[in-house]
Each structure stands twice: as C-alpha cells, then as structure tokens.
Regions:
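A structural "domain/chain start" motif
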Residues: 14-59, 64-67, 71, 115, ...
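Second-shell loop/turn segments in exported
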Residues: 40-46, 135-143
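Sec-dependent bacterial lipoprotein signal peptides
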Residues: 1-16
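Compositionally biased, intrinsically disordered linkers/stalks adjacent to structured regions
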Residues: 141-164
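Short, small-residue-rich loop/turn micro-motifs
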Residues: 37-39, 125-129
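Surface-exposed short loop/turn segments
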Residues: 63-68, 75-120, 128-139, 150
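Short hydrophobic/aromatic-rich motifs at helix boundaries and adjacent loops
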Residues: 9-10, 25-31, 79-82, 128-129
Length: 164
C-alpha cells in the first residue's frame, strides 16, 4: 500500500507543470513571425527611420520570445506604416519663443495571428520625445529615434502578444 501511495504521489508531482514567462507573452502555439518593412506614409518620415523601427521590432521579438524570424507569411505577421512624423514647439518662454520642441511619431500596425484570428488587430501607436528648441533636430535625431522606438516597440509587443 505504501508503494502505491508513494508512486501516486510521485506521479502527481511529475505531471504538475507550471508555465511562467517573464515577458508575459502569449504566442498561441506560434512557431515564427514575420515583420514587413514599415513604409513611410508621410513626407517627413525618412526611409532610414522606417528601417530602424522595422529592425528594432524584429530584434525585440527575437529577444523576448521563443519565436523564429521568417521573411514572410509567419504565424504572427506585422505590417504597417509611419503615418505621422512631426516636430512642434511645446513650451513657450516669456518672450514667446519655444524652449522645447517635440518629435511625435505615429505608426499604424496591422497584426495578423494566423492561428487565432480573433487576436488580429489594426491599431495606431503614438509616442514622442522632447528636445531643447535651440538644438537642431538632426543633431539629436538618433537619440530621439531610439527613445521613441523603445516605447513604440514595447507597446506593439504588449498589444500583440503581451496580453496588455
């Protein structure tokens, strides 16, 4: 009888399984993903920026998920475009001159989950970064792009597979 109880207990322990993910990703059984080049739909969005955002999204998905990157027709598919790229003054000084400017970028993303169609979406994501108005945009552009991309990519990930 003790052998039976011991074997039953060991069997229960072995059959217990806990799945935990530090990234919170839910991949619906997907094995791979594809990211199409995010196209500029506004005159100010440079192809270099679009390429940087596209590659950043690929890199983030590779680092944060068990999925493999494929060139097209992935189980999870990302495509989209840059629909707004603007610089506006945001903080006026006493002499009616702006002390800060804001670079704002809006991306429209179409996410397709080939395995669970009800998770598909098309959304816009907007993020921005501020910089001193006296600085030339081109001198701070790389840092602004990096800061904005980090936020955009995190939000796209959370909306698609992060269950947020």
């Amino acid at each position: 009888m003790r052998v039976f109880i011991t074997l039953s207990f060991i069997s229960m322990l072995i059959s217990c399984q806990v799945n935990y993910s530090f990234t919170g990703g839910q991949f619906s059984g997907a094995q791979n993903f594809s990211v199409n080049y995010l196209k500029p739909q506004t005159a100010l969005a440079s192809p270099a920026y679009c390429q940087q955002l596209t590659e950043g999204l690929k890199d983030y998905l590779l680092a944060q998920s068990p999925l493999k990157l494929v060139t097209q027709n992935g189980d999870l598919q990302y495509e989209g475009s840059i629909v707004e790229y603007s610089v506006v003054p945001i903080a006026a000084q006493g002499n009616e001159v702006a002390s800060l400017s804001r670079l704002s970028i809006t991306v429209k993303i179409k996410y397709t989950n080939q395995l669970e169609k009800e998770l598909n979406f098309e959304k816009t994501f907007t993020k921005y970064a501020d910089f001193p108005a006296g600085q030339d945009l081109f001198s701070v552009q790389a840092d602004l792009w990096s800061a904005i991309n980090d936020q955009l990519i995190q939000e796209i990930y959370n909306s698609s597979v992060g269950n947020w």
